[in-house]
Amino acid sequence: TLANMKSAISRLEGQGLSLLKAVNLRASHFYVKFKPADSAQYEQLQTDKRMTIYPYPLDYEIAVRGNRYHDPSLPKGTITYHYAAVKSDYVFDPKIPYEVLSALYIPEEDTSLKSKTSEAYVDQLLNQAYKQTGNFQDTIVAIKANSPQASYHPGGKIQVWDTRLQQYIGLEGVDMRARRWFTTHHARTDFWGNYQMEDTFKNPCNYSLWFSQEDFVVREHLIALTAWIDGPKQKANWNVDISTGYDRFISHVFRGAYRYHYGFIDGLKRPYLPVARLKYIA
């Protein structure tokens, strides 16, 4: 939060590190809970390119991985709350209910802190902020004053089992996400299922796979929300072989839709694209 970052900056100032001043710090983002009333509002949030929304809170560590979450305070069959970090100048749609949970300062996204010295300072700032909130698993073992921590590009390979070919094939076109707290990086898988984020992280990230594209989305038949597969929190690549079950079924529904929209269909007419994305229910 902004308050935690101000406190961390003040601690660093006490150690003689004063690249930023707590008194001058302003919110760069807001952490928001959206409360979509219907599927139209949910789809509007899903396709808003100014943010990345999730159907679960972002300010908690995920204790148990799973592909489903519904806020226990809401009745079954309703759309669960969704969460996102939006920039401080974000203009909200007054028709969609929302609640600002906290003001944020995300130093990794501060373009004024891009020099080598600034990066090392950001490492120390984040280290202090994590310690203050008890997130010791995210602290860095040792930080040198003018030497930033090494970064990495999240990536990996996604494959699905093809029963006709009797082998794994690449799952092309899915939205791969790598998230650290309130920051998300995206990449698309290629024909072979490979993906790599252009942006970097320095600590482990939460991976996830989302069955969505610009022109269509695969929704789950029971809850009608975008289908997704939750991944691990790690610093290494996330490689997945989807072999059986519902995830394999959804993957092949996505493959069929992807080919219908963008691949070779031997003269067939492409699907009609209305204003909204097409929804395929799996």
Give the residues covered by each predicted segment.
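Short, acidic Ser/Thr/Gly-rich low-complexity loop/linker segments typical of extracellular
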Residues: 180-194
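Long amphipathic alpha-helical scaffold segments
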Residues: 89-153
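A short, solvent-exposed loop/turn motif at the edges and junctions
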Residues: 208-228
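Short, ordered, surface-exposed loop/turn motifs in non-cytosolic proteins
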Residues: 12, 153-182
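A short, Gly/Thr-enriched small/hydrophobic beta-strand-prone motif that recurs across taxa
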Residues: 134-165, 252-265
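Catalytic zinc-binding patch centered on the HExxH motif and its immediate surroundings
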Residues: 187, 280-282
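Long, solvent-exposed N-terminal ectodomains/accessory regions
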Residues: 1-117
